[in-house]
């Protein structure tokens, strides 16, 4: 599965928005995601991509745009 599309699918499910043309938009500052949605996103990413992202190690600034999320998932897949 394409990582970018998989991440966008999860974000679409959580936000109800197509973010494919907003890859560098801060999804927290624009109100699309909150802390509860972050936990749901992490759980979905872990399940879909078979990666481990402990909530305790989640730094929102590293996961605040779709592009950053894709990059983090790709780096975790390669560990």
Curated annotation (Swiss-Prot):
Annotated Carrier domain residues: 1-77
Predominant place of localization: cytoplasm
GO (cellular component) term, any one: cytoplasm
Post-translational modification: 4'-phosphopantetheine is transferred from CoA to a specific serine of apo-DCP.
One Gene Ontology molecular-function label: D-alanyl carrier activity
Compartments where located: Cytoplasm
Biochemical pathway: Cell wall biogenesis; lipoteichoic acid biosynthesis
Entry's Gene Ontology BP terms: cell wall organization; lipoteichoic acid biosynthetic process
Pfam family membership, one: PP-binding
UniProt keyword list: Cell wall biogenesis/degradation, Cytoplasm, Phosphopantetheine, Phosphoprotein
InterPro entries: ACP-like_sf, DltC, PP-bd_ACP
O-(pantetheine 4'-phosphoryl)serine, modified sites: 35
UniProt xrefs under SUPFAM superfamilies: ACP-like
Family label: Belongs to the DltC family.
General function of this protein: Carrier protein involved in the D-alanylation of lipoteichoic acid (LTA). The loading of thioester-linked D-alanine onto DltC is catalyzed by D-alanine--D-alanyl carrier protein ligase DltA. The DltC-carried D-alanyl group is further transferred to cell membrane phosphatidylglycerol (PG) by forming an ester bond, probably catalyzed by DltD. D-alanylation of LTA plays an important role in modulating the properties of the cell wall in Gram-positive bacteria, influencing the net charge of the cell wall.
Name by which UniProt lists this protein: D-alanyl carrier protein
Primary gene name: dltC
């Amino acid at each position: 599965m394409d990582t970018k599309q998989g991440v966008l699918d999860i974000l679409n499910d959580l936000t109800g928005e197509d973010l494919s043309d907003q890859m560098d938009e801060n999804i927290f500052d624009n109100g699309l995601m909150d802390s509860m949605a972050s936990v749901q996103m992490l759980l979905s990413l872990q399940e879909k991509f078979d990666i481990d992202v402990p909530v305790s190690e989640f730094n929102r600034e590293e996961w605040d745009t779709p592009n950053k999320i894709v990059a983090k998932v790709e780096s975790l897949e390669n560990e």
